[in-house]
């Protein structure tokens, strides 16, 4: 995985993890942050570039520095969330212990009041809050002497009763309370509520909120909810920032919706606005049909007395979070322009803005137009396979992570590091729109579409500047700006790349497909032949029909001489081969238009791009349709030097500039593929010198590649091009080529 791909995948994981953190799903957030961290640490290119940062070029060094900053921030977020989970669990345990002690104290106080008024533990009419009988009082009163050995009946004679005969409950067996008991019970409950309000309550985490609190202290539930409202964490609306549709429909997202919807708290110096918002929010939630309505109907907290006490706890918690939050913005200044810290951020801030600020430290230093993950930024007419899909307007520049199209881009990055192949539903949709072709033949042609994943860019090809310029002018620019290339400027419908084998003709075709962002049909002779009579012509018709449907598109035919060889009149040519050539030429001619009389953009745009090592074997009619015929020669000294430097860029070697010049001089008449084979064989030299000991030698102990390795390999790897054949290429180029030499 390249450094650019590693950055994009890591950013996708981090974006979803930040959403998990904002919805208080800290466990899932930690897991995704750790996955993003492993994606960086386990990347071999990052490991290699990290050790050789001082010798890297500007672009790679920029990506490595960005990944290092991301790695630091991911570690900070993991540590912060781990501590947050531990603090919330400890706070929840304190709440549970407090509730248990409150229940014990209230039941003990009720028993003492009832005992003084004449209702002793032996009287079964004593009940606290409708739940406690005499036997339950015996289990909770731990201070009673010899409680485990005596019963209620044995305790009755030993307890001094002040007015046994005058007790209103002395002679009755009913569990219903009398008038005096009701008055005493209401006093106990008011004391119990006052003690609950005086306790500080922390907002429980999302995982703990699902378990619920004991039913005996339902007022504690209301206090917890009031604390969450004052904290600014309870929100009944959905998250305002965009997320991938695949994630929104997943079980994890459904589980997060069933609990609290929590947004990250931004500390503010003034808590009065937060308290007022908590009051309004609580009143609106209590009156709506929320999942907490049934729990809060019977016991509503006193808003005038509870919310101010919670605001004190809010101010304390705000200071603790403020010490960690600025760490996100501390690195954003390294990778991007300075952004306001959380302390200077406005109070009224939406969730989408907070998400964009959280992603600042993950924003790359530069967005490359060659990034395969940015295909959603272009219009549907420029996306090839995506032209049949309905998409939003394009996004440019820094709006890449702030626009509503973020969910499509994150989903595309999170699923794979390349554009996935067309699904069967997509194929059926395209074939239904093309009823004049057979369904099975159409599927066979669609399988020839090259799926992006091993993109080739102009910088990956050494030299060949004239060929690159010709391809940009004939293919790339017209596909990217069709409004400029109209009328007489209409691009050519055919282009031929010819030259010796191994000079980069196929690489140039792949680079054209990548740079023009078009559908790329890679066709060979076997793709258009069938054992059934007449199906080969139908395959050719289906090829051009689908190319028009999915335009802008490129039909690339490698070794075109095997498909469109010169037709003979002596009868030696097979009938099937002749019919295929005729149908191909007819369908190709249907792409041409009278350009001089047209002033509008020609749709669809389809280019037939071909490569051959035998240009003199191509049929005359096919040669006429190749308007641009570009010669790809053997690399010169400058190209060979550049190619060698690219091959040795990430290798451990001890070659000096003089050594490289010596290798360049010794590799005359070597093609690009010959130089690659030579460098690979020379790289095996240090391993060959170890012999059997290479099985036990560490990587660091292997010597670098030197000049002697190349001298030895030159004796083995010889040029593959015939010198007499080069003269024939030059003659054909002078006669039919786009530029004579």
Curated annotation (Swiss-Prot):
<keyword id="KW-0175">Coiled coil</keyword>
<keyword id="KW-0539">Nucleus</keyword>
<feature type="region of interest" description="Disordered">
    <location>
        <begin position="280"/>
        <end position="318"/>
    </location>
</feature>
<dbReference type="InterPro" id="IPR003960">
    <property type="entry name" value="ATPase_AAA_CS"/>
</dbReference>
<dbReference type="InterPro" id="IPR027417">
    <property type="entry name" value="P-loop_NTPase"/>
</dbReference>
<dbReference type="Pfam" id="PF09336">
    <property type="entry name" value="Vps4_C"/>
</dbReference>
<dbReference type="InterPro" id="IPR050304">
    <property type="entry name" value="MT-severing_AAA_ATPase"/>
</dbReference>
<feature type="compositionally biased region" description="Polar residues">
    <location>
        <begin position="137"/>
        <end position="155"/>
    </location>
</feature>
<dbReference type="InterPro" id="IPR003593">
    <property type="entry name" value="AAA+_ATPase"/>
</dbReference>
<dbReference type="InterPro" id="IPR015415">
    <property type="entry name" value="Spast_Vps4_C"/>
</dbReference>
<keyword id="KW-0963">Cytoplasm</keyword>
<feature type="region of interest" description="Disordered">
    <location>
        <begin position="137"/>
        <end position="214"/>
    </location>
</feature>
<feature type="compositionally biased region" description="Low complexity">
    <location>
        <begin position="197"/>
        <end position="209"/>
    </location>
</feature>
<feature type="compositionally biased region" description="Low complexity">
    <location>
        <begin position="330"/>
        <end position="344"/>
    </location>
</feature>
<keyword id="KW-0067">ATP-binding</keyword>
<feature type="compositionally biased region" description="Low complexity">
    <location>
        <begin position="309"/>
        <end position="318"/>
    </location>
</feature>
<comment type="similarity">
    <text>Belongs to the AAA ATPase family.</text>
</comment>
<feature type="compositionally biased region" description="Low complexity">
    <location>
        <begin position="161"/>
        <end position="173"/>
    </location>
</feature>
<feature type="compositionally biased region" description="Polar residues">
    <location>
        <begin position="346"/>
        <end position="356"/>
    </location>
</feature>
<feature type="compositionally biased region" description="Polar residues">
    <location>
        <begin position="298"/>
        <end position="308"/>
    </location>
</feature>
<dbReference type="GO" id="GO:0005524">
    <property type="term" value="F:ATP binding"/>
</dbReference>
<feature type="region of interest" description="Disordered">
    <location>
        <begin position="330"/>
        <end position="364"/>
    </location>
</feature>
<dbReference type="GO" id="GO:0008568">
    <property type="term" value="F:microtubule severing ATPase activity"/>
</dbReference>
<feature type="coiled-coil region">
    <location>
        <begin position="64"/>
        <end position="103"/>
    </location>
</feature>
<dbReference type="Pfam" id="PF17862">
    <property type="entry name" value="AAA_lid_3"/>
</dbReference>
<dbReference type="GO" id="GO:0051013">
    <property type="term" value="P:microtubule severing"/>
</dbReference>
<keyword id="KW-0547">Nucleotide-binding</keyword>
<dbReference type="InterPro" id="IPR003959">
    <property type="entry name" value="ATPase_AAA_core"/>
</dbReference>
<feature type="binding site">
    <location>
        <begin position="499"/>
        <end position="506"/>
    </location>
    <ligand>
        <name>ATP</name>
    </ligand>
</feature>
<protein>
    <recommendedName>
        <fullName>Uncharacterized AAA domain-containing protein C328.04</fullName>
    </recommendedName>
</protein>
<dbReference type="InterPro" id="IPR041569">
    <property type="entry name" value="AAA_lid_3"/>
</dbReference>
<dbReference type="GO" id="GO:0016887">
    <property type="term" value="F:ATP hydrolysis activity"/>
</dbReference>
<dbReference type="GO" id="GO:0005737">
    <property type="term" value="C:cytoplasm"/>
</dbReference>
<dbReference type="Pfam" id="PF00004">
    <property type="entry name" value="AAA"/>
</dbReference>
<dbReference type="GO" id="GO:0005634">
    <property type="term" value="C:nucleus"/>
</dbReference>
């Amino acid at each position: 995985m390249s450094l650019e791909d590693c950055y994009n995948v890591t950013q996708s994981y981090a974006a979803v993890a930040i959403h998990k953190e904002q919805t208080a799903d800290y466990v899932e957030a930690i897991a995704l942050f750790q996955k993003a961290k492993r994606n960086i640490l386990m990347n071999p290119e990052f490991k290699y570039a990290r050790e050789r940062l001082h010798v890297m070029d500007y672009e790679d060094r920029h990506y490595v520095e960005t990944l290092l900053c991301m790695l630091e921030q991911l570690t900070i977020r993991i540590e912060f969330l781990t501590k947050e989970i531990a603090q919330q669990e400890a706070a929840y345990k304190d709440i549970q212990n407090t509730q248990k002690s409150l229940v014990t104290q209230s039941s003990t106080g009720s028993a003492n009041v009832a005992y003084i008024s004449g209702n002793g533990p032996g009287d079964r009419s004593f009940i606290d809050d409708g739940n406690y009988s005499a036997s339950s009082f015996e289990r909770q009163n731990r201070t009673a002497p010899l409680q485990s050995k005596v019963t209620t009946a044995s305790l009755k004679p030993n307890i001094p009763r002040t007015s046994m005969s005058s007790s209103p409950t002395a002679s009755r067996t009913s569990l219903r309370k009398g008038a005096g008991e009701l008055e005493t019970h209401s006093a106990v409950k008011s004391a119990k509520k006052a003690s609950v309000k005086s306790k500080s309550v922390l907002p429980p985490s999302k995982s703990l909120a699902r378990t619920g609190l004991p039913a005996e202290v339902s007022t504690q539930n209301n206090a917890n909810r009031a604390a969450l409202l004052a904290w600014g964490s309870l929100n009944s609306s959905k998250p305002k920032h965009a997320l991938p549709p695949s994630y929104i429909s997943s079980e994890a997202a459904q589980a997060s919706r069933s609990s609290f919807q929590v947004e990250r708290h931004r500390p503010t110096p003034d808590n009065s606005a937060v308290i007022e918002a908590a009051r309004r929010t609580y009143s609106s939630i209590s009156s709506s049909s929320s999942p907490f309505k049934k729990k809060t109907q019977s016991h509503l907290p006193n808003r005038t007395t509870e919310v101010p006490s919670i605001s004190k706890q809010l101010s304390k918690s705000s200071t603790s979070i403020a010490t960690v939050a600025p760490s996100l913005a501390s690195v954003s200044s390294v990778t991007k322009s300075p952004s306001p810290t959380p302390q200077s951020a406005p109070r009224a801030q939406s969730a989408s803005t907070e998400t964009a600020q959280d992603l600042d430290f993950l924003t790359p230093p530069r967005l490359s137009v060659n990034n395969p993950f940015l295909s959603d930024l272009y219009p549907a007419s420029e996306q090839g396979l995506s032209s049949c899909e309905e998409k939003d307007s394009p996004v440019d520049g820094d709006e890449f992570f702030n626009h509503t199209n973020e969910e499509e881009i994150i989903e595309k990055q999170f699923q794979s590091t390349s554009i996935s192949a067309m699904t069967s539903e997509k194929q059926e949709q395209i074939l239904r729109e093309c009823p004049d072709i057979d369904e099975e033949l159409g599927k066979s042609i669609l399988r020839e579409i090259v799926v992006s994943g091993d993109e080739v860019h102009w910088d990956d090809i050494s030299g060949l500047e004239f060929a690159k310029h010709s391809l940009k002018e004939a293919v790339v620019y017209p596909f990217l700006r069709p409004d400029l290339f109209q009328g007489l400027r209409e691009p050519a419908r055919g282009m031929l790349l010819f030259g010796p084998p191994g000079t980069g003709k196929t690489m140039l075709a792949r680079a054209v497909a990548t740079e023009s962002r078009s559908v790329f049909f890679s066709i060979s002779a076997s793709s258009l032949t069938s054992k059934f009579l007449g199906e080969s012509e139908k395959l050719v018709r289906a090829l051009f029909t689908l190319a028009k449907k999915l335009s802008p598109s490129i039909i690339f035919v490698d070794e075109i001489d095997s498909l469109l060889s010169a037709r003979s009149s002596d009868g030696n040519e097979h009938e099937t081969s002749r019919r295929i050539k005729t149908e191909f030429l007819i369908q190709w001619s249907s792409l041409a238009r009278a350009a001089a009389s047209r002033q509008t953009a020609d749709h669809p745009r389809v280019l037939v791009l071909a490569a051959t090592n035998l240009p003199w074997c191509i049929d005359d009619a096919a040669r006429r349709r190749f308007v641009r015929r570009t010669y790809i020669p053997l690399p010169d000294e400058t190209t060979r030097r550049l190619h060698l430097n690219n091959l040795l860029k990430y290798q451990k070697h001890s070659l000096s500039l003089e050594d490289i010049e010596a290798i360049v001089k010794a590799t005359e008449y070597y093609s690009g593929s010959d130089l690659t084979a030579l460098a690979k064989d020379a790289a095996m030299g240090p391993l060959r010198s170890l012999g059997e000991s290479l099985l036990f030698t560490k990587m660091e102990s292997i010597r670098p590649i030197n000049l002697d390795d190349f001298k030895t390999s030159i004796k083995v790897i010889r040029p593959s091009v015939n010198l007499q054949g080069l003269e024939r290429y030059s003659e054909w180029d002078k006669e039919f080529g786009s530029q004579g030499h």
